[in-house]
UniProtKB/Swiss-Prot annotation:
It comes from the Eukaryota. The keyword Iron-sulfur does not apply. GO terms for cellular component: endoplasmic reticulum membrane; oligosaccharyltransferase complex. Component of the oligosaccharyltransferase (OST) complex. OST exists in two different complex forms which contain common core subunits RPN1, RPN2, OST48, OST4, DAD1 and TMEM258, either STT3A or STT3B as catalytic subunits, and form-specific accessory subunits. STT3A complex assembly occurs through the formation of 3 subcomplexes. Subcomplex 1 contains RPN1 and TMEM258, subcomplex 2 contains the STT3A-specific subunits STT3A, DC2/OSTC, and KCP2 as well as the core subunit OST4, and subcomplex 3 contains RPN2, DAD1, and OST48. This is Dolichyl-diphosphooligosaccharide--protein glycosyltransferase 48 kDa subunit. Keywords: Endoplasmic reticulum, Membrane, Signal, Transmembrane, Transmembrane helix. The gene is Ddost. It is a single-pass type I membrane protein. Residues 29-412 are lumenal.
Length: 441
């Protein structure tokens, strides 16, 4: 059956259009939904959004109460990342709510949340789901010793020292930063949640309370328990960051000079907000600190292929390739604290892996115990995704032909056995050939 040439000519433009559409879809970066209180935030925080676009992110701006909002459709996530820059929202629009966002996190999505003193209930509930408790509405972090010279008198324009940052270059960046400018609501971490990260804390003189009221009760957060920026990496490697300040990401704070109001304090021409905001966004959106397992191999020393079963006390070699995502490309990971465990129920062997070229390997002797074992690498470090690799193998006992014919430690027993045999042989000869003398009359 032949195709009409006219149909073929018409089909070529359609094929070209389809290929162009597929090319655009494949070339698009991570899909990111940005929820705003109003679209003016897009202009007041343009530097931050521009940094995301320059890194290839596809941003979709919508107001938080837009009735067409949707994160999930037909069981599939419509976006890879979610940015909530709408602290005062009381009800999300469309089918987005706290439960939907929690499901998005459970599905591995990344979320960046910025609050303020005008925080609404939805963000407070979302924080509680992630082990973060925000202070009451209209409260602010106050520090009478570490406030900026441009503060209006309530001491809520905080100058946070970089010494209060989490010691994790993967999260906060590797370069030294100028002091951080902060104005917003304080947070407290759930002490029972080990996954919460105290990224930026207040100083020992900071506290969270109503700035226009006298203190009549103990503040919600005091001293270094006051969190300015907090993070979370879930067990499924989903990442969330909570900032108590929406102004932290603003152009005004990025370009502002900073100087503490204390006499003799150093003046900086620019804050460290921009560098920190970029570093945090790179981490939360999984541009940094992402690891993956490459090919894994194991075999007896001197061989190349793994056997069907190992034998106890075999000398084996284990190798694994671990890669890290860097600037959109997978490169070999450089770490000196990666351990291998040889586990049955409990580890029988635990040893460090040594890097050789682009892979990590180690040689060790199997224990004199047979059963079903696992080569296990369980690498969990601050700022990195959880890396786990498990390979199951069987270890059998020695065959009867593989045992030593004589065991040196048993030589005394061998000697006693052979001496007993020789003595019995001599005794038998003597006994059989001995003849009693006949008695004479």
């Amino acid at each position: 059956m032949k195709m009409d040439p006219r149909l073929a000519v018409r089909a070529w433009p359609l094929c070209g259009l389809l290929l162009a559409v597929l090319g655009c879809v494949c070339a698009s970066g991570p899909r990111t939904l940005v929820l705003l209180d109003n679209l003016n935030v897009r202009d007041t925080h343009s530097l931050f959004f521009r940094s995301l676009k320059d890194r290839g992110f596809e941003l979709t701006f919508k107001t938080a109460d837009d009735p067409s909002l949707s994160l999930i459709k037909y069981g599939e996530f419509l976006y890879d990342n979610l940015i909530i820059f709408s602290p005062s929202v009381e009800d999300f629009g469309g089918n987005i709510n706290v439960e939907t966002i929690s499901a998005f996190i459970d599905g591995g999505g990344s979320v960046l949340v910025a609050a303020s003193s005008d925080i609404g209930d939805p963000l407070r509930e979302l924080g509680s789901e992630c082990g973060i408790e925000f202070d009451e509405e209209k409260t602010a972090v106050i520090d009478h010793h570490n406030y900026d010279v441009s503060d209006l008198g309530q001491h809520t324009l905080i100058v946070a020292d970089t010494e209060n940052l989490l010691k994790a270059p993967t999260i906060v960046g590797k370069s030294s930063l100028n002091p951080i400018l902060f104005r917003g609501v304080g947070m407290v971490a759930d002490p029972d949640n080990p996954l919460v990260l105290d990224i930026l804390t207040g100083s020992s003189t900071s506290y969270s309370f109503f700035p226009d009221k006298p203190i009549t009760q103990y503040p919600h957060a005091v001293g270094r328990n006051t969190l300015l920026i907090a993070g979370l990496q879930a067990r499924n490697n989903a990442r969330v960051i909570f900032s108590g300040s929406l102004d932290f990401f603003s152009d005004a704070f990025f370009n502002s000079a900073v100087q503490k109001a204390t006499p003799g304090a150093q003046r900086y021409s620019q804050t460290g907000n921009y560098e920190l905001a970029v570093a945090l966004s790179r981490w939360v959106f999984k541009e940094e600190g992402v690891l993956r397992v490459g090919p894994v191999s194991h075999h007896r020393v001197g061989e190349m292929a793994p056997p069907n079963a190992y034998t106890v006390t075999d000398l084996v070699e284990y190798s694994i390739i671990i890669e890290q995502l860097s600037n959109g490309k997978w490169v070999p990971f450089d770490g000196d604290d990666i351990q291998l465990e040889f586990v049955r129920i409990d580890p029988f062997v635990r040893t460090f892996l040594k890097r050789k070229g682009g892979k990590y390997s180690v040689q060790f002797k199997l224990p004199d115990v047979y059963g079903v074992f696992q080569f296990k690498v369980d690498y969990n470090r601050l700022g990195y995704t959880h890396l786990y690799s498990s390979t199951q193998v069987s270890v059998r006992p020695l065959q009867h032909t593989q045992y030593e014919r004589f065991i040196p430690s048993a030589y005394p027993y061998y000697a006693s056995a052979f001496s007993m045999m020789a003595g019995l042989f001599i005794f038998s000869i003597v006994f059989l050939h001995m003849k009693e003398k006949e008695k004479s009359d």
